[in-house]
Each structure stands twice: as C-alpha cells, then as structure tokens.
C-alpha cells in the first residue's frame, strides 16, 4: 500500500504511467532487494523491463548479499547456452539468486531445486507464467515446496481501483483454481516518492 498522497496522484493514470512509476520506485526496489536477500534457498526474481528495472534490481541485490553468495542475471541479452549453464549451476547450489526477465521464462520455469520465486514487476504476462509453471508451485517429487512472492501494488482510492491491483486479483483467481495455498500480507511502503511531475516528495 502506498502513501495516500501517492494514491491520489496516481488516480486516473494510464497503465504505462502506473508501471513506469512502480518499476522506478526506490522504496519498492529496496523492499524487493531486502525480501530477496533475506529468503533462504535458491531464489528467482522476475522482471519485465531490462534497462529500467532488471539491471537496477540486480545491482541492488549484488550490493546487499553476503560475500560468496552467487547472483546471476538472465535476460534476452544472455545467450541461450549461457542461460543453460546458469540453470545447471543453480541446480547444484542451495542459496543462489537469479534475476531474470519474464520473457526468458515465458514457456515455463525449468529450474529444479528452486525454493522461491519473486515477481518483481507487475505484468499481465504473469498469468501466462503462472499457467506454465503450474505444478512447479506445488510440492515437488522430493518434498520441496516452491514459494511464490507476488507483489500487488495498491494505489486504490474511493471509487478508483488501479490497473495493477486489478491484475493481482486475476492472479489470485489462478492461485485458487490451481489449488495453491496463499496468504495476503499488507505492506506499508514507506518513503515512496510522488510521481515525477509533482515537485513535492514524501
């Protein structure tokens, strides 16, 4: 949940304006970084935009992790053979982090030994990702459970519900349909800045 001033400023914004604000929000990116670093096990962080989000996230995460913890970056810029090498390495690790674009996993997440998935960018294409991973979020053959952290961005005001909040409701329908167990945790995102066309800051 964002500061009330931010919610009112975002009221009526286009979908692209909403996304641009979300992926460049420093407090949100810090939250994703802390969540990712604090998680135990192999963690996949997924993003949609390479330059303005993916590269920012991977740098923040690399700065925050303890020395020796492996952090990998995967986007369309990375050769398919290198992606396979990364996947093979991670399958042998127990505490690695992969920061990857949604496009590179649009046909499914094929990494065994994956403990956590973090959706870093709200995207309508996440529905396709959820459908493709299907059984991957259920208990695996060896008893391991993969946990998904889906960040829903709430800018709603009286009489207005923002795009990404509505999309998160669609994903929850999929969780219910697929039989996933889920919990909703409210997060008060402190220190969020106002959209750039406003001179004030919070």
PLM features: residue spans?
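Conserved RecA-like helicase motor-core motifs
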Residues: 44, 62-85
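Short, high-confidence coil segments that cap the C-terminus of an alpha-helix
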Residues: 40-41, 68-69, 94-95, 114
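Long, largely alpha-helical accessory region at the distal end of helicase-like NTP-driven motors
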Residues: 42, 180-202
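Conserved interdomain hinge at the start of the Helicase C-terminal
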Residues: 7-64
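Short, flexible loop segments at the rims of nucleotide/cofactor-binding pockets, characterized by
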Residues: 19-25, 74-78, 95
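Conserved RecA-like P-loop NTPase helicase motor core
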Residues: 76-181
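Short amphipathic
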Residues: 1-7
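Residues at the starts of beta-strands that form the adenosine-phosphate
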Residues: 42, 70, 144-147
């Amino acid at each position: 949940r964002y500061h009330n001033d931010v919610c009112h400023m975002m009221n009526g914004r286009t979908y692209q304006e909403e996304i641009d604000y979300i992926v460049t929000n420093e407090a949100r990116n810090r939250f994703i970084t802390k969540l990712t670093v604090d998680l135990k096990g192999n963690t996949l962080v997924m993003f949609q935009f390479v330059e303005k989000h993916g590269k920012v996230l991977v740098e923040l995460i690399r700065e925050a992790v303890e020395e020796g913890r492996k952090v990998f970056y995967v986007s369309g810029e990375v050769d398919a053979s290198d992606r396979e090498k990364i996947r093979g390495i991670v399958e042998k690790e127990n505490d690695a982090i992969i920061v990857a674009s949604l496009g590179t996993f649009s046909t499914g997440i094929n990494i065994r030994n994956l403990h956590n998935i973090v959706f870093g960018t709200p995207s309508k294409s996440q529905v396709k990702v959820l459908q493709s991973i299907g059984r991957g979020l259920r208990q695996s053959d060896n008893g391991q459970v993969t946990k998904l952290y889906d960040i829903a961005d709430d800018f709603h005001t009286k009489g207005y519900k923002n795009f990404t909040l509505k999309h998160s409701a669609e994903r929850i329908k999929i969780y219910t349909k697929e039989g996933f167990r889920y919990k909703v945790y409210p997060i008060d995102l402190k220190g969020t800045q106002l959209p750039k066309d406003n001179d004030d800051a919070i």
